[in-house]
Amino acid sequence: MHRLVALDVDGTLLDPAHNLSARTQAAIHAAQRNGVTIALATGKLLASVQPLLADLRLSGTHITCNGAALMAAATGAPVATWSLSDAQVELALAAIHTLAPEMAIAWYTTDAIYTDSPWSQLDETLAAYHEPPLRHVARLDHTLPPPLKFLMTGDHARLLCLRDALRERIGSAVTVVRTTSDFVEVMAPGVSKGVALRDLAARLAIPCEAIVAIGDGENDIALLDEAGLGIAMGNAMPALLPHAQQTTQSNAEDGVARALERLGLA
């Protein structure tokens, strides 16, 4: 019996224009009426998905910052966090500055995003993903709240090269992932949506075999691996497909709604 559904947001729950379709909204409402717990599993801040939580009538706890935080929807407070240590921050920033000195860096905390760069492509791209405005500071250092992750954006081919170079240089000390074609992100070692899902499921006393996870990106691999049933979107990155037991239609075709309907949850 499926008791918990974990849903990636961009590229999965939302359509290509970052909107929630009526069919998907109705399917999630139906699943909740059928006793299924719905948890979002996003790379974004909780504040960025609060309007979505309201539209879906979701409370409870949700996975944010690619698994670096569990956040309570009702209060906006962290339930659990896995931040980068001072040593990991120093290592990661040095590597990014060496390998991609032209790229702006976003420093994510539980409730804000900081950068030491002037207005740039980073601001524009994150705005398109409905993230809150970046807080521009003089420098990224220990005077800021501990970071849950670092994020970089840029040319897609350049990002792919950066991901591989960062993994080669510091991959034994931190987690490096390409979350969408737009982003490369750095988190503490062992941090993933899958680890956060395991923690959330334990808090809810739900066994992994009763979990369905749906996603489309490289950062959803661990999410699908942790669930009893992993479903890849029709628009999923090729790297995700070997980790899915099922596929559904793309996010332009109400893939989440169709998956929930086929499972008899909606």
Residues of each region from the PLM?
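Hydrophobic packing residues within well-ordered alpha-helices of enzyme cores
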Residues: 24, 49-53, 162, 166, ...
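Short, structured coil segments at secondary-structure junctions
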Residues: 56-58, 65-66, 74, 170-172, ...
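Mg2+-dependent phosphoryl-transfer enzymes with acidic/Ser/Thr/Gly-rich catalytic loops
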Residues: 1-4, 20-21, 185-266
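Short active-site oxyanion
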Residues: 35-39, 58-60, 148-149, 209-211, ...
